[in-house]
UniProtKB/Swiss-Prot annotation:
Pathway(s) it belongs to: Lipid metabolism; phospholipid metabolism
Keyword check for Endoplasmic reticulum: no
Name of the protein in its database record: Phosphate acyltransferase
Species this chain originates from: Ehrlichia chaffeensis (strain ATCC CRL-10679 / Arkansas)
Catalyzed chemical reaction(s): a fatty acyl-[ACP] + phosphate = an acyl phosphate + holo-[ACP]
Subcellular location: Cytoplasm
Origin organism lineage: Bacteria, Pseudomonadati, Pseudomonadota, Alphaproteobacteria, Rickettsiales
GO molecular function: phosphate:acyl-[acyl carrier protein] acyltransferase activity
PANTHER family, alphabetized: FATTY ACID/PHOSPHOLIPID SYNTHESIS PROTEIN PLSX, PHOSPHATE ACYLTRANSFERASE
Gene expressing this chain: plsX
Length: 337
């Protein structure tokens, strides 16, 4: 297996650079097996190097590049494009363009990450707007793809059509589904429901049934079921759906922990159920599916949650490595041709 190099923005996120560097070590030790991966770590040496020195194995699998600037959480994308060209985020993305690395991951400012990536890397052929995409657990044992998760607050019908094609290709490459079932998120399943944009996207997808396994509309109540493999929506709705799903997972865990300590009987029942409940929660734990790909860019760019700890960031690294190994962009180009 050939070695691949992943660029890492060590300064992005609420807990950077500690969570980033420790997350890299966690990924290397627990998630990547023998994947033959090295890291190009971009950040401010005064903050990153003292942490990196704690992890001998990681140091042997990485190169550190000192960058003087940081893209801040409140930086506007236009400002980051003009004034943050020596930042860890910019330099990490630029390493893909120059061929030094094969993918990049950052927990930093989403708008800046998208803007800089589009500026430096451009988009794939026939793609107007990239979309943020991830695979989420369903009620069964399977996963489904959800996009857009926030790259585009408003989307045209043609953009939703492109998202559907890209999401289908992602499901084929990452989830190994031969003919992914694709649906548009809507307030009802009847063809007359929804906005003009959604109904126009419905018609475009219906006309492309030879290229895509389009199943019509899906309501929010059904997305965690096993009805479809790809759910398509605009970034406004998609981001809300994702955050509500994460909130439900943490709320369920909190409610269960309180209920099993309310009495002696419930404590005993909790002990009996603890192992299975822990297993079930881990599957729905947002940390386990952290890492969303910016689909449609001419390069592998993965956005990690801004509040990711080391475990969550490690899973974003795993997503990045898998996207590179699966040659996801080549498969999207094939689907769009």
């Amino acid at each position: 297996m050939s070695i691949i190099s992943i660029a890492v923005d060590a300064m992005g996120g609420d807990f950077a650079p500690e969570a980033v560097v420790s997350g890299l070590d966690f990924a290397l030790t627990n998630l990547l097996d023998d994947q033959n991966v090295s890291f190009n770590i971009y950040g401010q040496g005064s903050q990153v190097l003292p942490i990196l020195d704690k992890y001998k194995d990681l140091k042997e699998h990485s190169v550190f590049i000192d960058t003087p600037e940081v893209v801040l959480a409140n930086d506007k994308p236009s400002f980051a494009l003009r004034k943050r060209r020596s930042s860890s985020m910019w330099c990490a993305i630029d390493s893909i363009k120059s061929g030094v690395t094969s993918g990049v991951v950052s927990s930093g400012n989403t708008g800046a990450l998208m803007a800089i990536s589009r500026f430096l890397l451009g988009t794939l052929p026939n793609i107007d707007r990239p979309a943020i995409c991830t695979a989420l657990p369903s009620r069964g044992e399977e996963y489904f793809v959800l996009l857009d998760l926030g790259a585009n607050i408003e989307s045209s019908s043609n953009a939703l059509f492109q998202f559907a094609i890209m999401g289908s290709a992602f499901a084929k490459a990452v989830l190994n589904i031969a003919s992914p079932k694709v649906a548009l998120l809507n307030v009802g399943q009847e063809e007359v429901k929804g906005t003009d944009v959604i109904r126009e996207a419905f018609l475009l997808l219906k006309q492309a049934e030879g290229r895509i396994n389009f199943c019509g509309y899906i309501e929010p109540i059904d997305i965690l079921g096993d009805k479809v493999d790809v759910v398509v929506t605009d970034g406004f709705c998609g981001n809300i759906v994702l955050k509500v799903a994460e909130s439900i997972a943490y709320t369920f865990k909190s409610v269960f922990e309180k209920s099993v300590t309310s009495s002696i009987i419930s404590k005993f029942a909790g002990l009996l159920l603890k192992s299975q409940m822990k297993k079930d929660f881990m599957r729905f734990n947002p940390k386990m599916y952290n890492g969303a790909m910016l689909l449609g860019l001419n390069g592998v760019v993965v956005k990690s949650h801004g509040n990711a700890d080391k475990v969550a960031f490690a899973h974003a690294i795993k997503v990045t490595v898998n996207a590179v190994r699966n040659d996801i962009n080549a498969k999207i180009i094939h689907e769009l041709s």
